Regions:
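Noncatalytic alpha-helical scaffold of FAD-dependent oxidoreductases
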Residues: 1-472
Length: 472
């Protein structure tokens, strides 16, 4: 076993005698909408966290990681929020068995930087590495390789869950508390607080990707290319132009690839094939006004991006180029201005691919603009009742907040429901309890497991109240 040195928790000024820092903070999700105020507890002391859970007031408690959920699942107006970023140690990495034992507050970026030099890789990554392990479990995140690797929790061997009674339970996918494991998977922190997890890693020869880029002339061409040979690639995603109307609506490109083998690299990269090349260039200042993204600026951006992405094959790319372009810029969400934005993401069955174009037409006709549009194919669903991915197409669009956005999203909700689809809890910030219940028919089964482990409803969030996830 190769042991990584323990990472010390970040220092916290003005901490209490028990090492905990308690503050009152205004919190939002990554979309910077619907701010609420809560008491925030930040500590690496598990006993302090357990006591805070046991003594939580009537507004309850919820855990929060790096705040990358777009909506309100890690907010708790008038209640307690446990900031997990102090609990960020990597306890060990077993290179032989390819297993990492990590705290829930450890980010995927930190974990990757630790394991890549040993020829290991985190098997499922979302669109950013700035997500904690606990958040990855709570949202059951997915990546561009869902069709080959499933969701993040498919690779979780065990997790330690702090429940409402202050006890810590070790859960496994096939253990005696399998139902609680599955309820925690995608359960948005409402079954308890994940403290620690063991993650099964993949083996890689290099830290690079070998990628193919294909231009598509419209939505139909895009879908045809995806269907033709998507299974030949480990990772697959597309970007498309949502501003151009008419016959070229949906033009864009497919970016697909797999982990590069040593033989795929040019000589200069073979000297250090496991170098983790993921720089951060700049931090967005909080100076941008709302409304900068309009039809004119979005059209120019779409035109540039489309023409830049020419068809080519066998391109060697680092993780930033291939997967995490937005991680080049810290706080990039500030680019939408103080009014913020929401990301609308849904999945529909393959046979309802018609909804993809129909939804984009509805957005264009409404006068709203989205410059960041991503389309992917999902593989089969898992057994977790609130896990989002299910077999079909998933579409994600970023929409700046402006007048009429609520009505547009209500329309999209009904279109998604009519097609047998559903929304992603980690992205949602505004749908209704009724619509959510219709999208997730296993919600009653999830509530039964959740209520059994938390009969006093101690775990709660702004999202859980809005969607009536926790009842009684």
């Amino acid at each position: 076993m190769v042991s990584i040195p323990v990472l010390k928790p970040r220092t916290t000024p003005a901490a209490d005698a028990d090492g905990a820092l308690r503050t009152t903070r205004r919190l939002t999700g990554w979309g910077r909408t619907a701010p609420t105020t809560a008491t925030v507890l930040r500590t690496a002391d598990l006993d302090v966290i357990a006591e805070a859970v046991r003594t939580a007031g009537p507004r309850g408690v919820v855990a929060r990681g790096l705040g990358r959920s777009y909506g309100d699942p890690a907010q708790n107006a008038g209640g307690l929020v446990v900031d997990m970023t102090a609990l960020d140690r990597i306890h060990s990495i077993d290179v032989e068995s390819a297993v990492a034992d990590v705290d829930a507050g450890c980010s995927l970026d930190t974990l990757l930087r630790a394991v890549v030099p040993h020829g290991l890789w985190v098997p499922v990554l979302p669109g950013t590495r700035q997500v904690t392990v606990g958040g990855a479990i709570g949202a059951d995140i997915h990546g561009g390789n869902h069709h080959t690797q499933g969701t993040f929790t498919r690779h979780v061997l065990s997790m330690d869950l702090l429940t409402a009674d202050g006890q810590v339970r070790t859960l496994t996918p096939d253990g005696p508390e399998r139902e609680l494991f599955l309820a925690t998977t995608g359960g948005m922190g409402l079954t308890g607080i994940v403290l620690r997890a063991k993650i099964r890693l993949d083996r890689v020869e290099t830290s690079y990707f070998i990628a193919d880029v294909e231009q598509a002339t419209d939505f139909g061409d895009m879908l045809e290319r995806l269907q033709r040979n998507d299974e030949d690639y480990t990772y697959s995603k597309t970007w498309f132009d949502s501003v151009t109307k008419g016959e070229h609506m949906g033009r864009g490109f497919l970016l697909r690839g797999s982990s590069a083998k040593l033989e795929d690299l040019p000589p200069e990269l073979r000297k250090d094939p496991l170098k983790f090349d993921a720089p951060q260039l700049a931090r967005f200042p909080d100076l941008f006004p709302s409304g900068m993204l309009n039809r004119l600026s979005a059209k120019a951006l779409n035109e540039f991006y489309y023409r830049k992405s020419k068809t080519k094959s066998g391109v060697v790319q680092n993780i930033t180029q291939f997967y995490h372009l937005l991680d080049l810029f810290a706080d990039w969400n500030r680019a939408y201005g103080p009014d913020g934005f929401l990301q609308y993401q849904f999945v529909v069955p393959f046979e309802r691919a018609d909804l993809l174009r129909a939804s984009m037409e509805a957005i264009v006709d409404s006068g709203h603009i989205s410059a960041l549009n991503v389309l992917k194919r999902f593989g089969d669903a898992n057994d977790a009742p609130l896990s989002f991915p299910t077999r079909g197409y998933t579409l994600a669009v970023d929409l700046p907040v402006k007048k009429g956005l609520g009505q547009l999203c209500d329309l999209l909700d009904e279109m998604v429901l009519d097609a047998g689809g559903r929304l992603y809890l980690a992205k949602d910030s505004r749908t209704t309890a009724d619509r959510f219940a219709r999208m997730y028919p296993q919600l009653p089964a999830w509530r039964k497991v959740r209520d059994a482990v938390d009969p006093e409803r101690k775990f709660a969030s702004d999202q859980s109240r809005r969607l009536q996830l926790v009842t009684g």
